[in-house]
Amino acid sequence: MAYTSVIPVRRLDRAVKYVMNKEKTTAVSLQDALDYAANRDKTEQSCFESSYTCTLETAFADMRQTKERWHKSGGVQGYHLVQSFAAGEVTPELAHQIAKELADRMLGGRYQYVIGTHLNTGHIHSHIVWNSVSCVDGKKYRSN
């Protein structure tokens, strides 16, 4: 069974950077989380990276642009979800597919996100970082 944790992000730039970061760091902002999720040193293969309505390379700029378009640049900037699996529980492909399905169902095609599935520890884990502002209608994300 997967373990998940969601962290609200106040600095989108740092969270994005964290997700794609080549060194293991602690998420501080959205830029950090996005950088870390797409970190190729941790994914080993580019097939374990995905994004929705943004590109991995420009995710922070794309998300910031959405915020500016809807005049919602303050407050929580995004969210960083970590989904971890026990050793041997899933293959990297399955873990990544589960993360994509979770993001699609949870965000309903309304929020930009990036996913990186990492293989650098004893357990496979995925990072999902998404924008707090909807690219469809400008509404802020609210969890139930």
Residue ranges, per PLM feature:
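N-terminal nicking endonuclease/strand-transfer module with a His-rich metal-binding environment
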Residues: 1-144
